[in-house]
A protein has these predicted regions:
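Non-heme di-metal
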Residues: 1-164
């Protein structure tokens, strides 16, 4: 290990971070009335995603769907149970209530991600069709119709986006 493989992993992480940051920048540009700047941020974000995906392919880290589901489940479960709980404790110790809210809601959403992966692993062969609804405030995912209010952040169902 080392050398090239580490460089590929670093490239993947860097590209993923850049893509997300640019998507958020695009949202801000839209809010401020700069649609062409938003488009530029989005197109570069897409390009960064391509770079990150290529690094994953070179690393041979894209496996079968069943293996990808199992890995994703383990990752989400670990993040929810370990990382976010530690982040909450640190934010509480620092007295940063905005960070406490962010970390605790993110932890709760990560737990729902793990449940969705677990359910998908149990029903892989069925390949059932569903519409997911994602809370645009905290990221909670409803499997089916959106709830009247998000169970994590409390926002109304009008803030949910459908994914068909």
């Amino acid at each position: 290990m080392g050398g090239t493989r580490d460089a590929l992993r670093q490239a993947y992480v860097g590209e993923a971070k850049a893509a997300l940051r640019l998507k958020v920048f695009a949202q801000k540009a839209e809010e401020e009335g700069y649609p062409q700047m938003a488009k530029l941020f989005r197109v570069i974000a897409w390009s960064e995603e391509i770079h990150g995906a290529r690094a994953l392919r070179v690393l041979k880290e894209i496996k079968t769907t069943e293996e990808n589901l199992a890995e994703s489940f383990q990752s989400e479960q670990g993040v929810a149970e370990v990382a976010y709980n530690q982040f909450v404790k640190e934010a509480e110790a620092d007295g940063d209530q905005a960070a406490v809210l962010h970390f605790s809601q993110s932890r709760d959403v990560e737990e729902t991600h793990a449940k969705l992966y677990k359910e998908a692993m149990n029903h892989l062969m069925e390949e059932r069709e569903t519409t997911y609804h994602v809370c645009q405030v905290c990221g909670y995912i409803a499997d089916g119709p959106p709830p009247e209010n998000c169970p994590v952040c409390g926002i109304g169902k009008e803030k949910f986006k459908a994914f068909r």
